[in-house]
């Protein structure tokens, strides 16, 4: 191929991610032209409604997928946590890139630690997964929906609308915004379990051999192992991107540490488990853990969670 067209959202973070992949492809394939095609998704346009209430899968991916299926673009760069586990016919996950920090973080102008937040503090997040885990730790908090790009969220924090907001450490690091905020508290995995695929970039592409061959070098073995477990877990539970599911797999040497949680958005009921396993079990352990959760009532919890959202 002489040219690859990348479908990308227009947010600053999405453009950073796409520029990063563009540079890697150009470095790998000398002389290849790589073009970014910016577009808005449903999730970018509807900003006055919590994501869970908009409904449907692929809120941040469908328009990009449509452009690939029409042949207007060849690949799309996504935050893997936004990518549904089932792909439209003709598309597939071509590569999973090395992961950034997978953890969630609390950003605040006044409070250095999560435990410093006063009773009834206002915390901004749209994620039901984050809301659930915040309320499990601190039922007194007032969790307020917060939509928009990272800059919009930071502006609202600085204007005093919130005592704290929750962001992914990956986005904080990629946009290099640590100097812009007073306090960053990073949650441990025992406090807040991330979303499937958090911190990884996923390359979606048309299911054509030439495109897949040109992008295969982007795959990172460790990221593939970890996110396979996480995506298998969510796939078996039949959970979308907007339901309260946390799953984190972390590979160190030949050992994988896994933490998972499923529950109601208000934190009143949840199922949580942790385990360690060997690297060679990565293709089965996510599914097995999901079936254990199902035996404990996870699917019923998720149905109730969708009704509450």
Curated annotation (Swiss-Prot):
Segments forming a coiled coil: none
Cofactor binding summary note: Binds 1 dipyrromethane group covalently.
Keyword Transferase tagged: yes
Cofactor (UniProt): dipyrromethane
Superkingdom, taxonomy of origin: Bacteria
S-(dipyrrolylmethanemethyl)cysteine modified-residue sites: 241
InterPro entries to which the protein is assigned, alphabetical: HemC, Porphobilin_deaminase_cofac_BS, Porphobilin_deaminase_N, Porphobilinogen_deaminase_C, Porphobilinogen_deaminase_C_sf
Example of a GO biological process term: protoporphyrinogen IX biosynthetic process
Remaining remarks: The porphobilinogen subunits are added to the dipyrromethane group.
Oligomeric and partner information: Monomer.
Family that this chain belongs to: Belongs to the HMBS family.
Full protein name: Porphobilinogen deaminase
Gene name in the database record: hemC
């Amino acid at each position: 191929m002489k040219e690859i067209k990348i479908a990308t959202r227009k947010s600053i973070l999405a453009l950073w991610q796409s520029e990063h992949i563009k540079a890697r492809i150009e470095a790998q394939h000398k002389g290849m032209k790589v073009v970014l095609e910016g577009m808005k998704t449903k999730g970018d346009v509807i900003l006055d409604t919590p994501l869970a209430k908009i409904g449907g899968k692929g809120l941040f991916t469908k328009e990009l997928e449509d452009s690939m299926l029409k042949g207007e673009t060849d690949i799309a760069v996504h935050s893997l946590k936004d990518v549904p586990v089932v792909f439209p016919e003709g598309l597939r996950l071509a590569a999973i890139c090395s992961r950034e920090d997978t953890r969630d973080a609390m950003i605040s102008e006044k409070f250095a630690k999560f435990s410093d937040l006063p009773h009834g503090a206002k915390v901004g997040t749209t994620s039901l997964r984050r809301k659930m885990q915040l309320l499990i730790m601190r039922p007194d908090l007032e969790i307020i929906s917060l939509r928009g790009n990272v800059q919009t969220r930071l502006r609202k924090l600085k204007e005093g609308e919130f005592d704290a907001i929750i962001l992914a450490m990956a986005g904080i690091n990629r946009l290099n915004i640590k100097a812009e905020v007073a306090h960053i508290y990073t949650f441990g995995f025992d406090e807040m379990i991330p979303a499937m695929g958090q911190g990884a970039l996923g390359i979606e592409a048309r299911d054509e051999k030439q495109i897949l061959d040109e992008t295969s070098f982007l795959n990172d073995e460790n990221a593939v192992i970890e996110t396979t477990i996480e995506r298998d877990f969510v796939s078996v539970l039949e959970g979308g991107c907007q339901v309260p599911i946390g799953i984190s797999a972390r590979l160190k040497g030949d050992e994988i540490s896994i933490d998972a949680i499923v529950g109601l958005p208000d934190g009143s009921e949840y199922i949580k488990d942790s385990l360690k396993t060997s690297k060679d079990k990565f293709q089965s352990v996510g599914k097995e853990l999901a079936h254990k959760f199902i035996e404990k009532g996870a699917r019923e919890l998720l149905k109730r969670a969708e009704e509450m959202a």
